[in-house]
Regions:
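Extended recognition/assembly regions associated with phosphoester-bond processing machinery
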Residues: 2-327
Length: 327
């Protein structure tokens, strides 16, 4: 668990938590957040964390029946986890939570909300691809991982998932990338992917990464590590932050996007994306990060500001994209 420190004064900011692979460990994640909330209230007197973002392998498993059968995972590794407690109402998620899908999901559940929707009170799935607002932050994301042989196929899978469909259902598709690329003129604050963007390791401490993960070396050398569609979206959308998971390690990078184009950026500062990948939930692992993110003041004013204005809302421009590309 890592924190970005005390908040800066004079700016409208939101305190958020970012999680790598959740693997069904919701109780442990929420407990870690509450512990950090308590510590920061005592130290800084600031309000609590407003939002939890999960970067895939969320495992919204409701039962040990159909949901178990739809997970691409050896049977000996299947665990019910704690999500079912939040689904049944036994527990309530203590803060708004948004997530994307990974490659180990209860696909039978996520298929029901594949365009985005609530999987439990206060827990929102962004869908195969999606864009929403939350309290002055525009958040976009794309679920799944890249596999070349499925990229240009349609989404033909439907429950009950059998055979290859158990895996292909979570593979990234060209249609989702095309739809998201139509939002390139909009300003993205946060973008989520389970798979890392291809080539992102070149913009961080790649040598340190390869010391810790020696088996990455060949894939990095041959350009096979990461998702080419995510790399394309990183270049097109240029979000302020990009969060990922999947590879079970922490890695940070700052990706430049070329010189500024006046008058859009009169300060002369080069536009960059701050990339962060996080680990899975295990003791002494870097699975959770807390940070302050500056929000759009005009959007905060539109939603009423304060805690009351911090709720999920549709992005009208994304809805227009979906309408224009639906057939």
């Amino acid at each position: 668990v890592h924190c970005s420190g005390a908040r800066k004064k004079g700016r409208e900011e939101m305190w958020i938590a970012v999680q790598g692979c959740a693997h069904g460990e919701l109780e442990a994640i929420y407990d870690a957040i509450e512990e950090t909330n308590k510590r920061h209230r005592e130290q800084f007197g600031q309000e609590g964390i407003a939002l939890l973002i999960c970067c895939g392998d969320f495992q919204s498993i409701r039962n040990a029946g159909a949901d178990f059968e739809s997970i691409s995972c050896p049977r000996k590794y299947r665990q019910l986890g704690s999500f079912h407690k939040y689904y049944s109402g036994e527990k309530l998620a203590p803060l708004p939570t948004i997530f994307i899908g990974g490659n180990h999901e209860a696909s039978s559940h996520l298929f029901e909300v594949r365009h985005g929707g609530w999987v439990a009170p206060n827990i929102y799935f962004l869908g195969h691809a999606g864009v929403v607002w939350f309290g002055g932050l525009r958040i976009g994301g794309m679920s799944g991982i890249y596999k070349r042989f499925d990229y240009h196929t349609g989404r033909y899978e439907a429950p009950p998932f059998q055979g290859d469909a158990v895996r292909s259902v979570y593979h990234q598709r060209y249609l989702d990338v095309f739809r998201l690329s139509l939002m390139a003129k909009e300003k993205f604050d946060v973008f989520l992917s389970h798979d890392w963007p291809k080539g992102v390791t070149a913009y961080g401490d790649e040598a340190d990464l390869l010391r810790k993960k020696k088996h990455f070396r060949d894939d990095v050398r041959t350009g096979q590590l990461g998702s080419p569609p995510c790399e394309e979206l990183l270049r097109r959308l240029q979000p302020r932050y990009w969060f990922s998971a999947h590879l079970h390690c922490k890695f940070a990078a700052i990706v430049p996007h070329g010189p500024p184009v006046p008058p859009e950026n009169p300060t002369g500062e080069q536009k960059v994306t701050k990339f962060l990948a996080l680990d899975k939930v295990l003791p002494n692992r870097h699975f959770l990060q807390f940070l302050d993110v500056e929000v759009h003041e005009e959007e905060v004013k539109r939603t009423g500001g304060g805690v009351e204005g911090r709720h999920f809302s549709y992005d009208p421009k994304w809805l227009a994209v979906l309408k224009a590309t639906h057939s």
